[in-house]
């Protein structure tokens, strides 16, 4: 029939994915992520210069050599939530680690892979507390070196804050969030996610 025998196919495919990774070899251990500059797949166990101190996880390195050579590192942590981080080295200078999809814990600032006007975008989830009763309420967002608001989303009582009929106005400046309501919605709690740039970049 012209079809290859099953044994022939199995032999041709054997050892094409050593250790099951499909990346040419098992992950090589690395103790300092700054030293992982050759393209490859690495394992980290208490490694330095990772997204966290004593980083445990995996690292994928893509390296381009030559003039203006660039290295990209993608890291995934093995402990806790499986977060994905990215950073680059251009001419030997490393950028900070950035989140691809931050876990958005309340009150924590995350530097993301997004850019706005060639500046990194940060994200922070904020608990505003109870909505105001037919008045306005100011809450500090606690962001240092706030530069430009890029976008925001919000929930009030489990519904979209921006489209809520009881909300007249939402104002966000370098220090505070102000929400103005036209009726008593104080039984509802408000949560917002701000995306912004910083003056330090």
Segments the model singles out, each with a brief description of its role:
Residues 76, 88-89, 114, 155, ...:
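A generic structural motif
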Residues 45-53, 57-65, 119-201:
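Extracellular attachment/recognition segments
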Residues 84-86, 112, 169:
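Short, surface-exposed charged micro-motifs
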Residues 11, 82, 106, 190-193:
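Coiled-coil-like amphipathic alpha-helices with heptad-repeat character
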Residues 7, 11-13, 18-20, 29, ...:
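Intrinsic disorder/low-complexity segments
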Residues 13-83, 90:
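Glycine-rich, flexible loop motifs
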Residues 1-39, 90-123, 145, 201:
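Glycine-rich, low-complexity segments
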Residues 83-93, 182-191:
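Short, compact, well-ordered microdomains
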